[in-house]
Design a protein with these regions (language model features):
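Short solvent-exposed beta->alpha transition segments
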Residues: 37-38, 44-49, 56-107
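Bacterial N-terminal signal peptides that target proteins for export
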Residues: 1-8
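Surface-exposed, charged secondary-structure patches
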Residues: 80-127, 134-142
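Bacterial signal peptide processing site
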Residues: 20-22
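C-terminal motif of bacterial Sec signal peptides marking the signal peptidase cleavage site
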Residues: 15-18
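Low-complexity, intrinsically disordered terminal/linker segments enriched in charged
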Residues: 134-160
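Extracellular mucin-like PTS domains
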Residues: 29-32
């Protein structure tokens, strides 16, 4: 009887070891993105692409430009899902007009207009990349993204 138990135990150990061994290769880590130039011209180009992506519903690249504090508010998947399920904003494309240093805590300001309304986004240069600060740029959106999905839909008045 002890021999049967020992054989069974050995078989379990061998099976467990076989199941846990990985025959696949580890995923290659993505190549790091090239650094962004630390210039007003580079920020203006990036802010224009950022606003165009948002205006046209390409939300992934928008989220990727958010700073860490902003990304901590909502996951990328939830951000994209909410905007796909409940599109917000104007049907008019924005026009990004300028970028300059001059905001709080060293922020750079990207000035843009939507349908004649002048707006400002706050950007920082972090680890050789331009990142968007949602908290400074759009505090009202922060409140919306902290809501549950059903509260978000109700607050924006979308049919869901």
């Amino acid at each position: 009887m002890r021999l049967l138990i020992a054989i069974a135990a050995s078989a379990v150990v061998l099976l467990a070891a076989g199941c846990s061994a990985s025959s696949s290769h580890p995923a290659a880590s993505p190549s790091p993105l090239p650094p962004d130039p630390h210039t007003a011209a580079a920020l203006l180009t990036i802010a224009r692409a950022f606003n165009h992506d948002y205006d046209t519903g390409d939300y992934g690249p928008v989220y990727e430009r958010w700073d860490a504090r902003s990304q901590a508010i909502i996951t990328r998947a939830d951000y994209i899902k909410r905007h796909k399920d409940c599109p917000s904003g104007s049907q008019t494309l924005s026009r990004t007009e300028s970028a300059s240093l001059g905001g709080p805590h060293g922020a750079w300001l990207a000035q843009y207009a939507i349908g004649g309304q002048q707006l400002t986004d706050y950007w920082f240069y972090v680890h050789r990349r331009w990142v968007f600060d949602l908290v400074l740029s759009n505090p009202a959106a922060v409140k919306l993204y902290r809501m549950s999905p059903s509260q978000f839909v109700a607050a924006l008045g979308c049919a869901h």
